[in-house]
A protein has these predicted regions:
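Helix-biased "structured C-terminal domain" signature
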Residues: 1-422
Length: 422
């Protein structure tokens, strides 16, 4: 279909240099004081940049970007800072009502349809704040719990329906379609990651517990459930190989059928350095998913070496359940699906892939795949300030699985998967 055409190779509607030019003044007004090149902290050479917001109201003050070129990494770092700071400061009009009351007269999103842990004191009859969102498919208006759609809105009246406030589905772009596409890809990645973690790690433990009881934690993951990928010639992968690093690359693509690539590497050459890192990418085009996974893998190493990002935890930390994925790994376990290699392999070109010319076509594909899995409601909350040359949205999909990032709550699809394979 016709629409917002993409620039080949970066999946954006304008060149990265133009993005930087558009948002430079906004970034400064939102508190960005520095854009730092941290590529040289590591030996790989894939560009990674950090944008710094010293007086951030966020839990983070350093944001990161990566890419095949320095200009792409610069744009990514600025846009991540703008995305989070815009979401922090946005205050769309809200109403105050209970779910029971509001759902009688309007489309109100049931908090229980979201696969996150509800607050201990949640009640359908308790008053909460709500803001408007739009169903991406039907165009209908929906009322969404404000603190689900927003980010760290502590001053908005009434408590949150949920235990935590995350950034899943929060995305920015040069235009609304670009932001929505980024958000949908992120949600597809989170969903797919959940099924991979359950299938390759937790199900083998469950099976062993039937035989060995309390010793269920001992033993390998299922390394063959998700095949390793034979990538073939690839410039980003060559940068790893040139410094004696050989990433494990897996195809995690699930029932969503959105190509999802996971890349990890263990570095045992440097002492006193966190040994294992990973990256992931999901996109209709498997080559874009691979590029995102490899560049994120490089970024995770640089950010770890930089040592200033507040959400990176030491290996011996006892994190909250929602921050387990940010804890460093201090030992290489080749029996884990994250780092172990599989005898089950497939070629990159054999993974079903969908390369479209427009963002609208990407979005149509993603929406079709979500709906094929019973994820029929896709709601967009626009957090974009007036008269800006960028867009920030929160996309909310009831039923999407987020457990891999927060270990909060398994939804019906994940539970059905567990029962089928246990």
């Amino acid at each position: 279909m016709a629409g917002m055409l993409k620039i080949d190779g970066i999946e954006r509607t304008v060149p990265a240099a133009e993005t930087i030019k558009r948002v430079a003044t906004t970034a400064e007004s939102l508190g960005v004081t520095r854009l730092a090149d941290i590529t040289g902290l590591d030996r790989i050479g894939i560009p990674v940049y950090s944008s710094v917001v010293p007086k951030s109201g966020d839990s983070l003050s350093v944001y990161n970007g990566k890419g095949a070129r320095p200009v792409d990494a610069q744009a990514g770092a600025l846009m991540e800072a703008i995305e989070r700071q815009t979401a922090l400061k946005a205050r769309p009009p809200h109403i105050e009502a209970s779910f029971s009351e509001l759902s009688k007269s309007a489309n109100a999103l049931d908090p229980k349809s979201i696969n996150q842990k509800l607050s201990d004191d949640y009640s359908d009859d308790r008053t909460y704040s709500w803001i408007e969102g739009t169903d991406l498919v039907t165009g209908e208006l929906w009322w969404i719990p404000a603190k689900l759609a927003g980010y760290l809105w502590h001053d908005v009246p009434h408590p949150s329906c949920f235990e935590i406030n995350d950034t899943n589905g929060l995305a920015s772009g040069n235009c609304r379609q670009e932001a929505i596409c980024h958000a949908l890809c992120e949600l597809a990645e989170r969903d797919t990651w959940t099924f991979a973690e359950l299938g390759a790690h937790h199900l083998p433990r469950q099976r062993r517990s039937l035989v060995y009881g309390h010793r269920a934690k001992d033993g390998p993951d299922d390394l063959d459930m998700f095949p390793c990928v034979d990538v073939g010639p690839n410039q980003l992968l060559d940068k790893f190989h040139a410094v004696d690093l050989f990433p494990v690359i897996r195809d995690l693509t699930s029932e969503l059928q959105v190509p999802t690539i996971f890349a990890s590497v263990a570095d045992e050459h440097i002492t006193n350095f966190p040994m294992a890192h990973s990256g992931m990418g999901a996109h209709p085009d498997v080559n874009v998913a691979l590029r995102r996974a490899l560049s994120e893998l490089a970024q995770s190493r640089c950010v770890d070496i930089q040592g200033v990002r507040e959400d990176i935890l030491p290996p011996n930390a006892s994190p909250e359940f929602f921050s387990l994925h940010t804890r460093r790994i201090s030992a290489v376990d080749r029996s884990s699906w994250y780092l172990g290699r599989s005898e089950n392999t497939r070629r990159l070109e054999d993974i079903p892939s969908h390369k479209f010319d427009s963002l609208e076509s990407d979005i149509d594909f993603l929406v079709t795949r979500f709906r094929a899995c019973g994820l029929d409601r896709i709601i967009v909350v626009d957090l974009t300030p007036d008269e800006t040359m960028y867009s920030v949205v929160r996309v909310i999909v009831p039923g999407i699985e987020l457990w891999a990032t927060d270990h909060g709550r398994l939804g019906p699809r994940a539970l059905a998967f567990w029962k089928k394979h246990a």
